[in-house]
From Swiss-Prot:
Residue numbers spanned by region SEC16A-interacting region (SIR): 1809-1869
Pfam family, one: SH3_2
Glycosylation sites recorded in the entry for this protein: N360, N631
Protein name as it appears in the record: Transport and Golgi organization protein 1 homolog
Species name: Mus musculus (Mouse)
Length: 1930
């Protein structure tokens, strides 16, 4: 708890640092950004169209998902964010995406508007969900990267490895960017490397070496890459903290889950961790142990400090990394591992171990701790990144063998591989390690390791020489890469330099083995880490936390003892450094403990520089623990280490000091082996020495406290190393060698298991498989699989390792490593080296060697092996003796390098399994297979990129199956040819088994490639090679050996823990299944007891089943996570995986493996509930295993149950028991309970209740029956009513039909009349139109003529003007021509003048020249004369001289005549001489003169020549001038001619234009004329139309007048008819009265004839009774009395005055025609007035009667006459009379006229009226046709005039007047009429003026003259009355 305050502090620091440069500002609120850039204000315009460069799946619905190659349409961009997002649509979905993921193909707009973003822009575009927790884009996308990083990198692992070889920095940068976890892990690895490099620098004291190292240049780049990756990782971590557990699990237990766990533990243990880490050394060790990740972070910080001390490139790099890591991790800005640990717990653990060791190394003997740490780190890496571990183990074994002799040579490799270890930690990054680091490490390791590896290879050739060699090469490469990769290339480079320095230092410190271990660890770790970095970082972190927390809590006490020792060795991780420092301080003891703990605990993070001394024991322990540690959390590894150390001391019997020194290595390794093998949890429980706090601190506060812890651990590690360097050297070498082999075996197991994991796990698993196979041959048997054949061990490793990988590769490694560690510890490294370390390991582990004897579980061999492992010498000898164990072949480093470089896929698959690789190389042409696999990978990649999500798996399966068949066929062919070679090579296993395994490897390899591109990460990657012998033997043999080894261990060093010892031996098998061990490690806290170890042995068997591993591999992330999580959180997927594994362990290896497989399949999508069940299941398994472990060896269950796996057997038994229990409970127990549940009281109460309910029901039934009766009655009544109504309805329907028929007939007539009218009107209209058109045409013609005349005049004027203009143009042209002629003349004159002047000029010039010549001649003559004068003067002077001379000579010579002449001749006398002289002079003068004359002549001639020449030139010039003048004149002439031509052309053009204009004007004139004519025509036509219209108007007016006249006439005629009819009616009435009187008289007269009279009176009474009844109710007669009867009686009632309105309706029903008459009579309005009161009074009662029954109101006149007659005299007569009168007179004409309205009233009315009168509905049909039938115009006309007359008539009878209006709404009135409501509408409506208007027009238009006349008089009143009456009567 001491570290808790520090943890809190770091949390606050991280909170402040949370805002990493990479993170986007969260201040936007619920927005990604405050601004958006759009093409328009509404952001609805397309801005870009692009194509997706890669697949993108958004973190939530706000982001759009697309695949590579999809078209993306961008609508707007977000501005202001650190990570630029664009918003666009892909097909039908819309959302955001990073702009860098698309390539812009087209830009739609250049305009960009910055618009404020609204919160609604950041909701789900589909559904509108806005409840998002995070609006930090970098976090969201970072978490997305984290989730995708593992699968992506697993898919790209091979490619990454290739690229890594090219440039680890680049590969890391790439990985870091896409995968934050890898970044974190790399950062961790870098930190670890930094620590290691630091330590190496401290050891070397040569920073220049690091700088000189070729990779030193890489640090900056790596640091930058780390920073960016850290920034993104911070965001990712931030997101992870928010990510739910299920997400983290699905993310391969990605850093998200780890982060959550860390965060939880971080919060809970903040204070404790910080306190522990900072408070005390012991607490720091514990904290380091418990808080693996925190320790790593702290260690990385220490590494940063150490490297800062080195002050080389690393300080800057690490500071950057630390800052980046701290920022990104948000935990500690100074802790480099905070992010990395979170990202990649596994690798950070390894790195932390390495870094922890590095600080220790730098502080103390950095060389030794790093080498030791490297060994363990490589072991841990084997656990973590099994490939790395395998390489590490192989290299460790080889290096231990070689390092003893030439450990220094390999030191550079560890340095190089140091960086790689981390990368290897990640299975995903495993291939990355192959990059630069691998190359460097390979180069260095080859150089350094050549001798060592040869030795190692030689020593291991018996085992798996080629595999171990390949492993060494791999380890070298991995270590080289790790240095580059883990520190990122900068660190790798620096550390490679440091590694070289370290190599020297290690050599100096007899840590050759350490160096080799370091190199191997780095290589293997880097490779493993590269692959496993993602998974291991995730899983190891999760496992580390889960296992670390749980195991640490439980194991704190144990680990505390060992923790300090280990703490010294783990300066890099505060926890690790704390533990490791102790180990390192103690020397080999602490180193060994540290190494063994670190490998187990720090497997992923452990630097590759664990000292060889410590490496031996620590390797043994680390072999066990590291593997479990890998699978478990780093803390768990540490806990395991501590526990192992304690157990080793306690159980082994070595004193604690001894165990700390040499014994510490061996015993701790053994103890670790026991707890880890027997119970990886126990190892963890040993590590519990770390407090749970520390675990929590690791989880939660790993980073902050680790800073201090790092220093303390470094100090303690230094002290421990200084204290016991020799012991460390001795034991470290021995232990490291043995441990390497053990680890190799364990790793081989794990590696084989690992092959089957998911894509990521596959890489790791395959690497580890390679390692585990190699080590499996070497240490497989010595480990768990060692007992079994290497194949079996391989299978077991694969099985155990795969689940462990699924659960946590580290756990597997830890679980396996413990066994190996025990073997190693138990045996001296030298012995192990000499003897087959595998054998000894096998013996130590208690595993049976396939060759050695399948040692039964009960055999004491196991115990002996353990005892040997305890004694270390004996087991080592056994291992030596066991040829099968030594059989593991080693592959040369060169071959491994070539494989790494050229065969990335095969290398990544077999990275950790050299045995399988060796076997693979033996049978196949790997290059050809690699080509096929690469082709398959390319096809799968293209299919994965191009296929849609819903059919991706189908497409991938198609491609996979096509490639699979091809590759398998090729492999079979190769196998046929390679069998012979394989036999020649001679494998341990039988060739058939090897062939089967090789084919399995091929299939696994194919599946490995296939699931790198799996759409479902959890799909099983590769089915593990068929167990066959390997399966059966690993499971079965291992368990028995483990049991045996248990007694042995119990007897021997592990006697303290006899049960655990066998368990440990089983654990090797379990270590094959690290996931189970991790669970145990999870449960180790719960039980650190040895009994658990036996269960571990069961688990080992389970872990032996590779199929589970593959499933786990399917869920690689889950697998890793589950391992760590199982340890920490049983609810995680890891827990589920572990649970099955653990159950399987005790039940049977097969069952457990199956469970692991099933669990592995499930974990990826396992929800928290399932994870909880998984943890529960794991706990149950653990308890069961513990219980089984407590059983004696002879009683412990075997690997299977009579050939059946334990798991199904147990499950079946449990299910049977449960089902039986349920059955019995549901049958027997339930029956009894039911019997006793019910009592008599209850029954009686129930009966009473039932009775009550029955009574209530009876009451309800009775009430319902009553209701039913009532309803029945009601139904009957309603039926009766319905019947009545139906009868009435039938009657009304009949009447309606009749009325409709009459309406139709009337309508037809009206239509015909209307048609006639319309035709006539049309003809009139046409005629008028023709007239108007003619007039208009005439006017138009006139207009056109006038227009044409005006246009002609205008055209003429225009023509005249044109002519004038033309004349003007011509005159102008003449003037121009004249001017031109004048100019020409002037030009000629000027030319002549020019010529004259030129001539005169020439003459003057000639004269001038002649004068000049004469002047010159004179001057020449003067000169000649002057010359002559001078010559003469000379002669004279000479003569004078001669004379003087002669005078002077005369006296001398005295007449010597012989004197020579001047010319040498002897002259005569002087005189002669003088004369001669004078002659000579004269001759001379003459000649001179002659010469001068000749010269003058010559000069003259020359002058003449010159003059002639000049004249010639002048003449020529003149000629030229003349020619020029001539040409100029010609040109001028040509110009003038051209001008003339142009002028002529212009004239012509003007003429043409004029003509054209003239033509155009003419055209315009013609057009205008035409237009004018058209206008005139139109006008004339319009005039004609106007005239026609006027005529029509006149005609219409006339017609209107005529119609009015006709209406008046019709009115008059109708009135006359009415009067006549009324008169007739009155006459009839009088006749009737007379008849009545006659009857009375007859009665009186017939008094005698009483009987006859009585009879007659009776009859009359019968007939008169009705009329009497009718009289009192005049309105009822229709309804009360049938129409026929009513005629008589009604007539009687109306009798008083037929004119007054006697009803025709009664008679009409009897005879329809009668009604028409009455209708006509109804028009009697005038007669009424005549009749006076009678009419008024009678009609009033009659109106109602008529209205009620019929429209007889219109017919009252005649009807009353008949009635009256009938009344008075006899009904029969009255009827007859009424019939006669009505039929002929009124009915036909009147009804026809009014009914027809306007058109056909008369005829129609004649027929229909009787019908109408016959029934009350009669009048209705008339009004409908009249109103509806009559078209509105006609009807209106008719109505208008008619209404007025109607009103006129109606005033007499107000009733009629009022109702008259109602008739206008016939439809309404008709409705009630149909119902025959008697009084609803009285006759007045019938009389309504409606009928009046219609009849007159109808009469006018359509009625024949005869009827019209009749209708006219009656039409206005009677007809309308009829129609209205007909309407109202119904």
């Amino acid at each position: 708890m001491a570290a808790a305050p520090g943890l809190l502090f770091w949390l606050f620091v991280l909170g402040a640092l949370w805002w990493v440069p990479g993170q986007s500002d969260l201040s936007h609120g619920r927005r990604f950004s405050d601004l958006k850039v759009c093409g328009d204000e509404e952001c609805s315009m397309l801005m870009y169209r692009g194509k997706a460069l890669e697949d993108f799946t958004g973190p939530d619905c706000r982001f759009v998902n697309f695949k590579k190659g999809d078209d993306v349409y961008v609508y707007y961009k977000l501005a202001g964010g650190s990570l630029e997002l664009w918003a666009g649509s892909v097909e039908h979905s819309f959302g955001y995406f990073p702009k860098d993921l698309i390539k812009v193909l087209h830009k739609y707009t250049e305009e960009e508007l910055h618009i404020p973003a609204d919160e609604t822009d950041f909701v789900c575009f589909e559904g509108g969900r806005d409840d998002f927790n995070s609006y930090n884009v970098e976090e969201l996308l970072g978490s997305l990267e984290l989730e995708d990083s593992v699968p992506e990198e697993s898919k790209k692992a091979e490619e990454v490895s290739q690229h890594r070889e090219k440039s680890p920095e680049e590969s890391r940068g790439r990985e870091l960017d896409p995968v934050p976890e890898p970044e974190a892990f790399r950062a961790d690895s870098e930190d670890g490397e930094g620590a290691f490099s630091e330590s190496t620098e401290g050891l070397q004291g040569q920073p220049s070496a690091q700088e000189s190292h070729p990779h030193t240049s890489g640090p900056a780049a790596n640091a930058q890459g780390v920073q960016s990756s850290l920034d993104t990782f911070e965001e990712i971590l931030h997101d992870k903290l928010k990510v739910p557990g299920s997400e983290s699990r699905t993310g391969n237990s990605s850093p998200a889950s780890v982060e959550r766990e860390k965060t939880d533990a971080y919060k809970v243990l903040k204070t404790e961790m910080s306190l522990d880490l900072k408070t005390k050394f012991g607490s720091t060790a514990d904290a380091l142990v418990s808080d693996d990740e925190a320790t790593r972070l702290v260690t990385s910080l220490e590494d940063g400090f150490d490297e800062a001390l080195d002050a080389e490139y690393y300080p800057m790099e690490e500071e950057e990394e630390v800052e980046e890591d701290a920022d990104s991790s948000d935990e500690l800005p100074l802790l480099t591992f905070s992010d990395k640990d979170e990202k990649v717990p596994g690798k950070p653990m390894i790195e932390k171990y390495l870094t922890d060791k590095d600080p220790n190394l730098s502080e103390e003997d950095k060389v030794e701790p790093p080498t030791w740490g490297d060994a363990f780190f490589s072991i841990v890496t084997g656990g973590e990144g099994k490939p790395g571990v395998v390489d590490l183990e192989r290299s460790i074994e080889e290096e231990e063998d070689v390092s003893v002799s030439s450990s220094h040579q390999r030191k550079p490799q560890p340095a190089a591989g140091y960086t790689d270890s981390e990368d290897e930690g990640d299975d995903l990054f495993v291939e990355e390690p192959k990059t630069n680091d691998v190359k460097d490490s390979e180069t260095d390791p080859e150089l350094v390791i050549t001798g060592e590896e040869k030795d190692i290879q030689e020593s291991r050739k018996g085992l798996v020489q080629p595999e171990s060699q390949s492993e060494d090469a791999k380890s070298e490469t991995a270590s080289a890469y790790r240095l580059q990769g883990s520190k990122l290339n900068p660190l790798s480079a620096a550390e490679k330099g440091r590694d070289f320095t370290l190599k020297a230092v290690f050599e100096k410190k007899e840590n050759g083995l350490k160096e080799s271990v370091i190199h191997i660890s780095k290589e293997t770790l880097h490779e493993d880490k590269t692959r496993e970095i993602q998974r291991d970082s995730l899983e190891s972190e999760l496992v580390h936390r889960a296992l670390g927390s749980s195991v640490t809590e439980n194991n704190k006490p144990k680990s505390l003892g060992v923790a300090p020792l280990l703490g010294n060795n783990k300066p890099d991780a505060s926890k690790d450094s704390t533990e490791v420092p102790d180990g390192s301080v103690s020397g080999p003891k602490a180193g060994q403990q540290e190494g063994f703990l670190e490998p187990g605990l720090k497997t992923q993070h452990q630097p590759r520089f664990s000292p060889p001394e410590e490496t031996g024991p620590s390797r043994e322990l680390g072999g066990k623990v590291p593997i479990s540690g890998r699978n478990l959390s780093w803390q768990q590894e540490q806990d395991v280490a501590a526990v192992v150390g304690k157990h080793a001391n306690e159980k082994t019997g070595f004193p604690e000091e001894e165990s700390r020194e040499d014994g510490t290595d061996a015993e701790q390794a053994r103890a670790i082996r026991r707890p880890q093998e027997a119970e990886s949890p126990e190892v963890l429980s040993v590590q519990p020495g770390r407090p749970d706090e520390e675990e929590e601190e690791e989880e939660g506060d790993n980073y902050p406290p680790e800073g201090l812890m790092e220093d303390e651990n470094a100090v303690s590690a230094q002290q421990s190393r200084e204290n016991s360097p020799s012991a460390r050297d001795g034991r470290s070498d021995m232990n490291s060698q043995v441990f390497e082999k053990v680890i190799l075996g364990t790793l081989n197991l794990n590696t084989e298991k690992t092959k089957q994991p998911a894509n990521m796990i596959l890489e790791t698993g395959q690497e580890s498989e390679t390692t585990s196979e190699e080590a499996g041959d070497v240490g497989k048997e010595s480990g768990h699989s060692v007992v079994v054949d290497s194949e079996e061990s391989h299978l077991a490793d694969m099985r155990a390792q795969r689940p462990s990988q699924v659960h946590g590769l580290r756990d597997e490694t830890a679980a396996q490593t413990p066994g190996s560690g025990e073997a190693v510890l138990s045996k001296n490294p030298n012995d192990l080296q000499k003897d087959n370390p595998e054998e000894e390991l096998v013996n130590t582990l208690g595993l049976e060697d396939p060759g050695v004897g399948e040692i039964s579980e009960g055999e004491p061999e196991d115990t002996k092996e353990f005892g040997v492992s305890e004694s270390q010498g004996t087991d080592a000898e056994d291992l030596r003796d066991d040829p099968s164990r030594q059989a593991t072949p080693e592959i040369p480093d060169i071959v491994l390098k070539s494989i790494r470089e050229d065969l990335p896929i095969i290398n990544s698959f077999f990275k950790d399994d050299q045995q399988s690789l060796h076997r693979f190389l033996k049978y196949f042409d790997v290059r050809e297979l690699e080509g096929l696999l690469e082709d398959m990978s390319i096809r799968l990649r293209s299919a994965h990129q191009n296929s849609l999500p819903y059919n991706m798996e189908k497409v991938l399966d198609k491609v996979f199956r096509a490639s699979e068949s091809r590759i398998l066929s090729m492999a079979e062919k190769m196998l046929d040819t390679g069998v012979a070679k394989n036999r020649d090579l001679g494998s341990k296993e039988s060739s058939p088994l090897e062939e089967a395994e090789v084919l399995d490897d091929i299939q696994d390899l194919i599946y490995f490639v296939r699931y790198q591109y799996s759409g479902v990460e959890t799909a099983p990657l590769v089915t593990p090679p068929p167990p066959e012998e390997g399966w059966a033997r690993p499971g079965e043999e291992r368990q028995p050996p483990q049991q045996d080894s248990l007694p042995q261990e119990n007897t021997g060093d592990l006697s303290v823990q006899p049960p655990e010892e066998p368990e440990l031996s089983d654990q090797p098998v379990t270590s094959v299944q690290p996931p189970e061990e991790p669970e145990l490690s999870d449960q180790p806290v719960t039980s650190v007891q040895p009994p658990e170890e036996p269960e571990l042995s069961d688990q080992p068997v389970t872990s032996v089943q590779p199929p589970e591993e593959p499933e786990l591999s399917d869920q690689p992330v889950t697998g890793y996570t589950s391992t760590s999580e199982v340890s920490q959180k049983p609810d995680t997927k890891k827990d589920i995986d572990l649970g099955p594994v653990m159950e399987g362990g005790p039940v049977g290896a097969g069952d457990v493996q199956k469970q692991l497989e099933t669990i592995a399949e499930e974990p990826a999508a396992v929800p928290p509930l399932e994870s909880a069940f998984g943890s529960l299941y794991a706990f149950i398994l653990y308890l069961s295993k513990m219980l089984l472990a407590t059983l004696p060896d002879n009683v412990q269950p075997g690997p299977d149950f009579y050939g059946l796996p334990w798991q199904p057997v147990i499950i079946t038994a449990v299910l049977g028991i449960v089902s039986f229990a349920i059955f019995s409970w549901r049958t027997i127990l339930v029956v009894k309970s039911r019997v006793y549940q019910v009592t008599e009281k209850q029954i009686s109460e129930k009966l009473e209740n039932i009775k009550k309910e029955n009574a209530e029901l009876m009451q309800k039934l009775s009430s319902y029956e009553q209701k039913i009766k009532e309803s029945k009655k009601y139904v009957q009544e309603t039926k009766k009513q319905n019947m009545i109504l139906s009868d009435e309805a039938v009657k009304y329907k009949d009447k309606i039909k009749i009325l409709e028929e009459t309406n139709v007939s009337l309508g037809d007539k009206a239509k015909s009349l209307r048609l006639q009218l319309e035709s006539e009107r049309e003809q009139n209209v046409k005629n008028q139109d023709l007239i108007l058109e003619n007039k208009k045409s005439i006017e138009k013609l006139k207009d056109v003529i006038s227009m044409n005349a005006s246009e002609l005049s205008e055209v003429q004027v225009a023509l005249n003007e044109a002519k004038l203009s033309e004349e003007n143009v011509k005159s102008e042209c003449h003037r121009v021509q004249e001017e031109n002629a004048r100019l020409k003349k002037k030009k000629e004159q000027l030319q002549q003048q020019v010529e004259e002047w030129s001539k005169s000029h020439a003459e003057l010039t000639g004269q001038i020249k002649s004068f000049e010549k004469s002047q010159e001649d004179l001057e020449i003559a003067l000169t000649h004369k002057d010359d002559n004068i001078s010559a003469l003067t000379n002669c004279i002077t000479q003569l004078n001289r001669l004379e003087c001379e002669l005078e002077s000579e005369d006296p001398d010579k005295g007449g010597n005549e012989s004197d020579d002449l001047a010319n040498g001749e002897t002259g005569g006398d002087r005189s002669e001489k003088i004369r001669n002289r004078i002659k000579q002079m004269m001759d001379v003068s003459r000649t001179q003169t002659a010469v001068s004359i000749v010269e003058e002549d010559l000069k003259l001639l020359q002058l003449k020549l010159r003059a002639s020449m000049s004249t010639k030139c002048n003449l020529e010039d003149q000629i030229k001038k003349l020619e020029d003048d001539r040409s100029s004149l010609q040109t001028a002439k040509a110009g003038l001619e051209d001008e003339c031509k142009t002028l002529r052309q212009k004239v012509e053009i003007l003429n043409e234009l004029y003509q054209q204009k003239e033509m155009a004007l003419q055209k315009k004139l013609s057009q205008e004329e035409y237009e004018r004519q058209d206008r005139e025509q139109r006008l004339t036509a319009a005039d004609e139309k106007v005239v026609l219209a006027a005529e029509e108007v006149k005609t219409y007016k006339r017609r209107i007048e005529e119609m009015e006249e006709e209406l008046q006439k019709t009115e008059r005629s109708f009135k006359n008819q009415i009067a006549a009819h009324e008169k007739k009616a009155h006459d009839n009435w009088l006749k009737a009265r007379a008849a009545e009187r006659a009857m009375a008289e007859e009665k009186r007269e017939a008094a005698n004839l009483r009987h006859k009279l009585l009879e007659m009176t009776q009859k009359m009474a019968m007939r008169q009774d009705e009329p009497v009844i009718v009289k009192p109710m005049p309105g009822r007669p229709n309804t009360q009395n049938p129409p026929r009867r009513g005629l008589l009686s009604q007539n009687g009632s109306f009798g008083p005055s037929p004119v007054s309105g006697g009803e025709c309706s009664p008679p009409l029903p009897a005879e329809p025609p009668g009604r028409p008459l009455s209708a006509t009579l109804s028009r009697r309005d005038t007669p009424r007035s005549e009749f006076g009161s009678l009419d008024r009074h009678l009609p009033r009662p009659r109106w109602p009667s008529e209205a009620s029954g019929k429209h007889s109101a219109s017919d009252p006149g005649p009807a009353p006459v008949v009635n009256s007659s009938s009344r008075s005299s006899s009904p029969a007569k009255a009827v007859d009379e009424g019939k006669v009168n009505m039929a002929p007179k009124g009915p036909p004409p009147f009804p026809g006229v009014p009914l027809m309205g306007g058109p056909v009233p008369p005829p129609i009315r004649y027929g229909p009226p009787p019908q109408l009168c016959g029934g009350p509905f009669g009048p209705r049909p008339l009004p409908p046709p009249f109103v509806p039938g009559m078209h509105p115009p006609l009807g209106v006309r008719e109505y208008a005039p008619g209404v007025l007359p109607g009103k006129r008539d109606l005033p007499l009878d107000p009733r009629e007047f009022l109702p008259g209006h109602t008739p206008f709404r016939p439809p309404g009135s008709l409705g009630p009429r149909e119902f025959f409501i008697p009084g609803t509408r009285l006759p007045p409506p019938t009389h309504g003026p409606q009928e009046y208007p219609p009849p007159p027009p109808a009469v006018r238009d359509s009625l024949p003259s005869g009827p019209r006349e009749e209708a006219k008089p009656a039409s206005p009143s009677s007809v309308q009355d009829r129609s209205q009456a007909s309407k109202p009567t119904p």
